[in-house]
Amino acid sequence: MRLLRAVVLPGLGAIALLAAAGWAVRLLGGDDPREDRTVRAFQNAFGHRSDEHAGATDSAEPTRPREVIDRVTEPLSCYSGVPQTIANGAVWCGVTWLLARDRRSAIAPAAVLALETACFVASAALVGRPRPEGVWRPEPPHATSSFPSGHTAAAFALHGTLADLLERHGARRARLLGRLLRYGVPSAIAFSRVYRGQHHISDTVAGAALGRWSAAVVRAELLP
């Protein structure tokens, strides 16, 4: 009953809220919203051509990094990929167990990714938002819905939980490092996903909300 009340029912509520938000965003802005104009303009400022015609989402220009921002966002986007995130979570489960010898703490990284992923997959399937149109996109997109951003959600969820673990176990400089993990790294990943044409801005906002919520649930249940 505790799991049902503390995790399952709130998770269903989160899925419903995300789906409603996604439908509203699509209804109000369509599948080529005004927010994408900002992304196109920003990409153009760094020398990446964009095509205003619907469906022309992948530029024919070379995908090698040319600007500093390209060289920075490429590894960030790669770091937040699905296999990398799963491996990252598994590694931190092991590291936490070795350092803390606390089962609840050790499963926290896996638990937060499981919760975030379940909510992401369900809400994305319900929303079905297409990826941005007419943008520079150096890597092929995933087949899942653009809303919410799963990479962003996972980044905020996992790194938020890592920050909570540092604070719970009294690590040195936990406050400073915790802020970097909780806000800095995930925000940089969210930016990279938008800049590289993988998501609408609103996708990453929703992903950040999902990730923060997932971390809060795990903190309350496993890291009180």
Feature-to-residue mapping (PLM):
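Short hydrophobic alpha-helical membrane-entry/anchor segments
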Residues: 19-32, 97-103, 121-130, 191-199, ...
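Alpha-helical transmembrane segments of integral membrane proteins
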Residues: 2-14, 104-112, 177-181, 202-203
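Membrane-embedded catalytic cores of phosphoryl/pyrophosphoryl-handling enzymes
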Residues: 135-224
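Hydrophobic, membrane-inserted alpha-helices
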Residues: 68-74, 89-95, 160, 184-190
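Small-polar-interrupted transmembrane alpha-helices in polytopic inner-membrane proteins
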Residues: 110-129, 177-191
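Alpha-helical transmembrane spans of integral membrane proteins, capturing the lipid-embedded, hydrophobic core
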Residues: 11, 15, 89, 109, ...
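Interfacial segments of alpha-helical transmembrane regions
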Residues: 94-118
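N-terminal transmembrane-helix/juxtamembrane module of multi-pass inner/ER membrane proteins
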Residues: 1-84, 88, 125-140
